[in-house]
């Protein structure tokens, strides 16, 4: 299965970013695209390194894009980078210019693990005109509840910079 370590300049982020892209060997273009989002403790390489993603999609006419999302929760951070805009708006346009991807809502879906599961739902709900479906695997969906509101939570300052005080009992 063709694999691309795709690097591009994100105007939204103002920095170089990356995504792993799997291209189908079956079917006729244009292909639907799955945006597969990583969790908080990983990066865009995790799906390729720690799963059998290539085997799972080998016989499907599907492009899989695994973008780098940092520790962003796929949000436009209160203090930091606008990852929701970068991945929800800009990245599909970049992918569709560079790969044989469908260019409509029906050809785009999101899935993610943990932080990426939150991101998949957030992006699908923020951009319903862009994404037809979303899947959350063990999504980090319960902000305001354990463990995010613990005063001793080591991640709390970073989460507050990203999400703002109101999301995590600030």
Spans of model-derived segments:
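Non-catalytic cap/lid and distal C-terminal segments of serine-dependent acyl enzymes
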Residues: 1-170
